[in-house]
Curated annotation (Swiss-Prot):
Subunit text: Component of the tetrameric DNA polymerase delta complex (Pol-delta4), which consists of POLD1/p125, POLD2/p50, POLD3/p66/p68 and POLD4/p12, with POLD1 bearing both DNA polymerase and 3' to 5' proofreading exonuclease activities. Within Pol-delta4, directly interacts with POLD2 and POLD4. Following genotoxic stress by DNA-damaging agents, such as ultraviolet light and methyl methanesulfonate, or by replication stress induced by treatment with hydroxyurea or aphidicolin, Pol-delta4 is converted into a trimeric form of the complex (Pol-delta3) by POLD4 degradation.
Cofactor: [4Fe-4S] cluster
Region annotation (Disordered) ranges: 1-27
Biological processes, Gene Ontology terms: base-excision repair, gap-filling; cellular response to UV; DNA biosynthetic process; DNA replication; DNA replication proofreading; DNA synthesis involved in DNA repair; DNA-templated DNA replication; error-free translesion synthesis
EC number: 2.7.7.7, 3.1.11.-
Single GO MF descriptor: chromatin binding
Pfam families per the UniProt record, alphabetical: DNA_pol_B (PF00136), DNA_pol_B_exo1 (PF03104), POL3_N (PF24055), zf-C4pol (PF14260)
Protein name in the entry: DNA polymerase delta catalytic subunit
GO cellular component annotations of the record: chromosome, telomeric region; delta DNA polymerase complex; nucleotide-excision repair complex; nucleus
Origin species: Rattus norvegicus (Rat)
Highest taxon of source: Eukaryota
Length: 1103
C-alpha cells in the first residue's frame, strides 16, 4: 500500500471484451493490458449487469472461509505420482538448506535410531515436474580443529574428551540440558594451517566432533581458556574452523553448492508417508553420505519450475496517521503467481474486505470480517505453496503488518506461513551497518522453506538511485509510471462503493505485479541462483549476509582438497594501507581522440601472477630461516614476501583461476546457446563469475573479517600502483616522433586500472589502432595473466579532475559514438537536485555532441536567469538524501535530518524512517540562517507559497558543477565572471509567504491590477486605471484560460497514467514532476479566480 512510501497501481483502458463470469479469467497475456486500461468497459459492464448478477457467487461466500472449493485447480502443484524409494531415485533442485535438532529415525545401512538430540539438516527444493520436496539429511555432526599440544598422543584422547565433556556440561548448567555427551569424538589427524608458508608440511591436529552446533562456541571458548590434560598440564588450544556455519560446513564436506541438483539413489532414502513434518508433497530421510551432488554444469544448469508469489496489501489508515496494525484494518490483499520460465502469471487473486466489483483477468473474493480475510490469505499461501515470495517492502511492512494484525485480532491459525507444520512465523528486528550504506534497521520474518526476495531490499543493495519508491524504480527500469495514492485516501475508497473498492483492488494488483516484472527484468532470481552456485552458499545467505561468507565457502572447499585449515582470527580495526594510484590529470578540453587502455581483472590478475595468498606468505626473516633461494620467493613493492608457485601454489590464485576459466566457458556456451531460458541462466552465471574474483581481493583487505591479511591487500595495491606508472612510462617512451610516430604520446590521466592516452592523431580509427597496439606492447612487459586491453576512445574528451571526466565514447565503430559517458559528474550523481543533473547533462551535450561551447554557455545563463526569476518548476529543485541514522548520531546538523524531525512533529505517520530517502527544498529565510534550518517538504512549500532560496541553489548547487565543466574551456578566472555574474543574474523574483514571520501581525492591502498602486477599496483598479478596466479584465481572463488549459492537460496526463478518463485524480507521487506542476497550477488557478472576483459580477451590458 502507499503506506510503504511507494506508488499504488495505475491502469488504463482495456479492449472491449465479451461478458465473463466473476471467477473466469482472461488469457494471461492480456492481464497487463487489462490492468493498464479498465475504464472503457464500464458502459458495457452496466449493460450486462443482469447477466453479471447471475454469475455472482452465492451470498454465503461473503464472510465465509476460503475453502479448497474457491481455489482454481491451476493454482495447485501437480499431484506427485507414486514414488517407490527402493527402485526409483529422487532428483530435485534444492533452494534452501537449514538445520534443526531432533531424533534420528532408522535408515538403510545407517546407525540405529537414537533418542538423543542430534542436528538434522533440511533441504527444501523442487523436482523437474514441479513437486515440492523436503529432504531430512542425517548423520552429519559439527566439528572443528585445534593443533595438538607438544607431547600429545593417542593415549590422551579419551582423557581430553572426558575433561571437555565435563567442562561443557558445567558451562551449560541453567540452560538447555543435554540428552547425551557433548563431545562425540576427538581424533588425531595431520593438517596444516593455511596462514603463512611454514615449510614443514602437515602437523598433528585434533578434530573435535560435537553433538550440537550450539556447543561450538562454548567448546571453543573453554579450549582457548585451557583444558587439563593428564601429564601435559592445562594447555590452551587455538581453534581452527570453529566459526564456520553448520550449513556451510555440511555443504563443503558434501560438495554441495547453493541451488544445485541433488540425487537420492534408489534404496538409500525413506519416504515419509505418515507423520510428515512439513507441507511438502515429497518428504524423505537420507544419510548425508548417500546424497549425490551434481555440479551445475550441462544439463544440471537448468532451473526447476519454481513458483514465485508476489503480493501487496492495503490498509485503511486514519487521517494523517500512518497505519498501525493494532488499530487499522487490512482491507485488501492481492497476489500474483508465476512459474519460472513462463511468460505470464498463472494466478491473479484479489481478497477484499466488503464486496468489490469484478476485475477482468483476476479472481475477486470478498469477506465481511477482517479475520476471515486474513485467514483466507494464509490458507491460500499454504495451498499455492510458493517457493519464492516477493513484493515491494514486504520485509519491513507487509509481512510484519499482516502477522501483527492477525495477532491483534487473535487469528491464531494465521502466522504459519512457512513449510514446517506447526512452526509459527515470527518477527524480529535486525540492524545492518556498513561504511557504504550507513545503518539500516529492518525486520526479519521467519518463513522456513520459502525464499523471501523483497525487491526494495534488492534495489537498495544493488543500485544507486535518486528515489526508491515503487513508482520511481518502475519508471527507471520498466519505463512505466503508476499512480500513488496517499494512505489517508485509501480509507475513503474503501468506505465508498463496490466500484471504488475495485479501483483500489486494481491499484493493489499493480503493486503486486510491478515487483514481479522487476524480478524478471533485472534477472534477480536467476542471478542470485547462479551466484549461490558459483560461491557455494545457500540462496538465503546471499539475501541476508554480507560478502565474506561467499569467499569463506570457496576458501574452505579449496583448503579441504589440500589438507589446509582456516584459523579463527580475532579481528580488530587495524592499520590501513595505501590505495590505488591515480596519475595526476592534465585537465582540459581535448578536441582530439583519447584512447583508454584498461587492465583486465587487475587485482585478481596480480594475485595470480605473483602467487599472493595466505598459504604463500612469508613472515619477516622466514625466507632465510627456511633456506629459500632468491628465485623461490618474491618481495612485493610494499616489502612483503611470498613464495613462488614453484614452491607452493596459493589457494587464492587457484580459486581465481577456476572462476576466470569457468567464466570463459560460460561466455562460450552463451554465444552458442539459442534457448532464451538457458541464455538467462548462462548470462547470470557469467555475471556471477565476473563479480566473484573482485570479492576475493576485498576479503583479504577487510580489517574486521573472518581472515584479514594486510600483507596481501597492500601488496596487490602496491603492484597496481607500480604497473600504472610503468604503463605510463612504456607508452610515452615508445610512441614518440623519434620512433616514427606522428606525435609524442602523452598519458593524460590514469586511475586504478586504466590509463587515458593522447597519441596525437586526429581520427578515432587511428586512435583505436594505436590503442590496440599499445595494449599488446605493454602486456608483453608483465607476467601472465596480467593483460592490458584496449577498451574505448573518447572524442572529444573533457577532463575536469581526478575521477571526474566526460566524453563521447567509441568502443566498436569509429564512425559513430556509443553514448556520452560521464564519471563523477553531477549528471550521474544523486546527492543534488535534478536541475543540476539536467543542466550539466544538457551543457555537456552541447559541448561534446554539438561541439558548441558558446551555445552551452548561453544555455547555462538562461537556466540561471530562470532560476533567479522563479521560473523553474519546484520538482527540479528537490534534493533527496538518505536517513542513515538517528539525528543524535550525526556529527553535525543535516538538512534532511532536521526536516525529518520537523515532519515527525507535524505528522508522525508520514514522517521518514531510517533508510528512507528524504526529499526537501531550501526556502528563503533571514540572512545568516543555517541551510539545515531552511530545508522544507516540497508539498508544504507549494501549499503555503513559501519562497525558494534561489541564491542558495545558484551558489551551493549550480556554481561548482558548472565551473568544473566550463573552467577547462573558458579558463578559471573567466568562467565565474561569465556564468555567475552579469545581466542574467540581476533580475530576481521573490514569492511572498503566506505563513510565518511578521505576516502574522500585518494587514494586507489591495493594490491596483493595472499600476500596482495601493487602493483603499475592494475593487480591481484605481481611479486612474478605470478607463482601462475592460482591457485589464480581458487580460486576466486570458491568463485564467491559459492556466485552465494547462491544468486540464496535466489532469488528463494524470488520468491516462491512472488508466481512467472518468475518475478524479488522487495521485500524490512525489517522484513525478507532473504532480508538482499540477499542484502549482491548481494553486495559481485559485489565486487567479480570486483576482478576477475583485472586478465584481458582470454588468447588464455583458449580457
Amino acid at each position: 500500500m502507499d503506506g510503504k512510501r511507494r506508488q499504488a497501481p495505475s491502469s488504463g483502458v482495456p479492449p472491449k471484451r465479451a461478458c465473463k463470469g466473476l471467477w473466469d479469467e482472461d488469457e494471461p497475456s492480456q492481464f497487463e493490458e487489462n490492468l493498464a486500461l479498465l475504464e472503457e468497459i464500464e458502459a458495457e459492464n452496466r449493460l450486462q449487469e443482469a447477466e453479471e448478477e447471475l454469475q455472482l457467487p452465492p451470498e454465503g461466500i461473503v464472510g465465509g472461509q476460503f475453502s479448497t472449493a474457491d481455489i482454481d485447480p491451476r493454482w495447485l502443484r501437480p499431484t506427485p505420482l507414486a514414488l517407490d524409494p527402493s527402485t526409483e531415485p529422487l532428483i530435485f533442485q534444492q533452494l534452501e538448506i537449514d538445520h534443526y535438532v531432533g531424533t534420528s529415525p532408522p535408515l538403510p545401512e545407517g546407525p540405529p535410531a537414537s533418542r538423543n538430540s542430534v542436528p538434522i539438516l533440511r533441504a527444501f527444493g523442487v523436482t523437474d515436474e514441479g513437486f515440492s520436496v523436503c529432504c531430512h539429511i542425517h548423520g552429519f555432526a559439527p566439528y572443528f580443529y585445534t593443533p595438538a599440544p607438544p607431547g600429545f598422543g593417542a593415549e590422551h584422547l579419551s582423557e581430553l574428551q572426558r575433561e571437555l565433556n565435563a567442562a561443557i556440561s558445567r558451562d551449560q548448567r541453567g540452560g538447555k540440558e543435554l540428552s547425551g555427551p557433548a563431545v562425540l569424538a576427538i581424533e588425531l589427524c595431520s593438517r596444516e594451517s593455511m596462514f603463512g608458508y611454514h615449510g614443514h608440511g602437515p602437523s598433528p591436529f585434533l578434530r573435535i566432533t560435537l553433538a550440537l552446533p550450539r556447543l561450538m562456541a562454548p567448546a571453543r571458548r573453554l579450549l582457548e581458556q585451557g583444558i587439563r590434560v593428564p601429564g601435559l598440564g592445562t594447555p590452551s588450544f587455538a581453534p581452527y574452523e570453529a566459526n564456520v556455519d553448520f550449513e556451510i560446513r555440511f555443504m563443503v564436506d558434501a560438495d554441495i553448492v547453493g541451488c544445485n541438483w541433488l540425487e537420492l539413489p534408489a534404496g538409500k532414502y525413506v519416504r515419509r508417508a505418515e507423520k510428515k513434518a512439513t507441507l511438502c508433497q515429497l518428504e524423505v530421510d537420507v544419510l548425508w553420505s548417500d546424497v549425490i551432488s551434481h555440479p551445475p554444469e550441462g544439463q544440471w544448469q537448468r532451473i526447476a519450475p519454481l513458483r514465485v508469489l508476489s503480493f501487496d496489501i492495503e490498509c485503511a489508515g486514519r487521517k494523517g496517521i500512518f497505519p498501525e496494525p493494532e488499530r487499522d484494518p487490512v482491507i485488501q490483499i492481492c497476489s500474483l503467481g508465476l512459474r519460472w520460465g513462463e511468460p505470464e502469471p498463472f494466478l491473479r487473486l484479489a481478497l477484499t474486505l466488503r464486496p468489490c466489483a469484478p476485475i477482468l483477468g483476476a479472481k475477486v473474493q470478498s469477506y465481511e470480517r477482517e479475520e476471515d480475510l486474513l485467514q483466507a490469505w494464509a490458507t491460500f499461501i499454504l495451498a499455492m505453496d510458493p517457493d519464492v515470495i516477493t513484493g515491494y517492502n514486504i520485509q519491513n511492512f507487509d509481512l510484519p503488518y499482516l502477522i501483527s494484525r492477525a495477532q491483534t485480532l487473535k487469528v491464531d491459525r494465521f502466522p504459519f506461513l512457512g513449510r514446517v507444520t506447526g512452526l509459527r512465523s515470527n518477527i524480529r528486528d535486525s540492524s545492518f551497518q556498513s561504511r557504504q550504506v550507513g545503518r539500516r534497521d529492518s525486520k526479519v520474518v521467519s518463513m522456513v522453506g520459502r525464499v523471501q526476495m523483497d525487491m526494495l531490499q534488492v534495489l537498495l543493495r544493488e543500485y544507486k538511485l535518486r528515489s526508491y519508491t515503487l513508482n520511481a524504480v518502475s519508471f527507471h527500469f520498466l519505463g512505466e509510471q503508476k499512480e500513488d495514492v496517499q494512505h489517508s485516501i485509501i480509507t475513503d475508497l474503501q468506505n465508498g462503493n463496490e466500484q471504488t473498492r475495485r479501483r483500489l483492488a486494481v491499484y493493489c494488483l499493480k503493486d503486486a505485479f510491478l515487483p514481479l516484472r522487476l524480478l524478471e527484468r533485472l534477472m534477480v532470481l536467476v542471478n542470485n541462483v547462479e551466484m549461490a552456485r558459483v560461491t557455494g552458499v545457500p540462496l538465503g545467505y546471499l539475501l541476508s549476509r554480507g560478502q565474506q561468507v561467499k569467499v569463506v565457502s570457496q576458501l574452505l572447499r579449496q583448503a579441504m582438497r589440500e589438507g589446509l585449515l582456516m584459523p579463527v582470527v580475532k579481528t580488530e580495526g587495524g592499520e590501513d594501507y595505501t590505495g590505488a594510484t591515480v596519475i595526476e590529470p592534465l585537465k582540459g578540453y581535448y578536441d582530439v581522440p583519447i584512447a583508454t587502455l584498461d587492465f583486465s581483472s587487475l587485482y585478481p590478475s596480480i594475485m595470480m601472477a605473483h602467487n599472493l595468498c595466505y598459504t604463500t606468505l612469508l613472515r619477516p626473516g622466514a625466507a632465510q630461516k627456511l633456506g629459500l633461494k632468491p628465485d623461490e620467493f618474491i618481495k612485493t613493492p610494499t616489502g612483503d614476501e611470498f613464495v613462488k608457485a614453484s614452491v607452493r601454489k596459493g589457494l587464492l590464485p587457484q580459486i581465481l583461476e577456476n572462476l576466470l576459466s569457468a567464466r570463459k566457458r560460460a561466455k562460450a556456451e552463451l554465444a552458442q546457446e539459442t534457448d532464451p531460458l538457458r541464455r538467462q541462466v548462462l548470462d547470470g552465471r557469467q555475471l556471477a563469475l565476473k563479480v566473484s574474483p573482485n570479492s576475493v581481493y576485498g576479503f583479504t583487505g577487510a580489517q574486521v573479517g573472518k581472515l584479514p591479511c594486510l600483507e596481501i591487500s597492500q601488496s596487490v595495491t602496491g603492484f597496481g600502483r607500480q604497473m600504472i606508472e610503468k604503463t605510463k612510462q612504456l607508452v610515452e617512451t615508445k610512441y614518440t616522433l623519434e620512433n616514427g610516430y606522428d606525435a609524442n604520446a602523452k598519458v593524460v590521466y590514469g586511475d586504478t586500472d586504466s590509463v587515458m592516452c593522447r597519441f596525437g592523431v586526429s581520427s578515432v580509427a587511428e586512435a583505436m589502432s594505436l590503442g590496440r597496439e599499445a595494449a599488446n606492447w605493454v602486456s608483453s612487459h608483465f607476467p601472465s595473466p596480467i593483460r592490458l586491453e584496449f577498451e574505448k576512445v573518447y572524442f572529444p574528451y573533457l577532463l575536469i579532475s581526478k575521477k571526474r571526466y566526460a566524453g563521447l565514447l567509441f568502443s566498436s565503430r569509429s564512425d559513430a559514438h556509443d553514448r556520452m559517458d560521464c564519471k563523477g559528474l553531477e549528471a550521474v550523481r544523486r546527492d543534488n537536485c535534478p536541475l543540476v543533473a539536467n543542466l550539466v547533462t544538457s551543457s555537456l551535450r552541447r559541448i561534446l555532441v554539438d561541439r558548441d561551447p558558446d551555445g552551452a554557455v548561453a544555455h547555462a545563463k538562461d537556466v540561471i536567469s530562470d532560476l533567479l526569476c522563479n521560473r523553474i518548476d519546484i520538482s527540479q529543485l528537490v534534493i533527496t538524501k538518505e536517513l542513515t541514522r538517528a539525528a543524535a548520531d550525526y556529527a553535525g546538523k543535516q538538512a534532511h535530518v532536521e526536516l525529518a524531525e520537523r515532519m515527525r512533529k507535524r505528522d508522525p505517520g508520514s514522517a521518514p524512517n531510517l533508510g528512507d530517502r528524504v526529499p526537501y527544498v531550501i526556502i528563503g529565510a533571514a540572512k545568516g540562517v543555517a541551510a539545515y534550518m531552511k530545508s522544507e517538504d516540497p508539498l508544504f512549500v507549494l501549499e503555503h507559497s513559501l519562497p525558494i532560496d534561489t541564491q542558495y541553489y545558484l551558489e551551493q548547487q549550480l556554481a561548482k558543477p558548472l565551473l568544473r565543466i566550463f573552467e577547462p574551456i573558458l579558463g578559471e578566472g573567466r568562467a565565474e565572471s561569465v556564468l555567475l555574474r552579469g545581466d542574467h543574474t540581476r533580475c530576481k523574483t521573490v514569492l511572498t509567504s503566506k505563513v510565518g514571520g511578521l505576516l502574522a501581525f500585518t494587514k494586507r492591502r489591495n493594490s491596483c491590477i493595472g499600476c500596482r498602486s495601493v487602493i483603499d477599496h475592494q475593487g480591481a483598479v484605481c481611479k486612474f486605471c478605470q478607463p482601462r478596466e475592460s482591457e485589464l479584465y480581458q487580460k486576466e481572463v486570458s491568463h485564467l484560460n491559459a492556466l485552465e488549459e494547462r491544468f486540464s492537460r496535466l489532469w488528463t496526463q494524470c488520468q491516462r497514467c491512472q488508466g481512467s478518463l472518468h475518475e478524479d485524480v488522487i495521485c500524490t507521487s512525489r517522484d513525478c514532476p507532473i504532480f508538482y506542476m499540477r499542484k502549482k497550477v491548481r494553486k495559481d488557478l485559485e489565486d487567479q479566480e480570486r483576482l478576477l472576483q475583485r472586478f465584481g459580477p458582470p454588468g447588464p451590458e455583458a449580457w
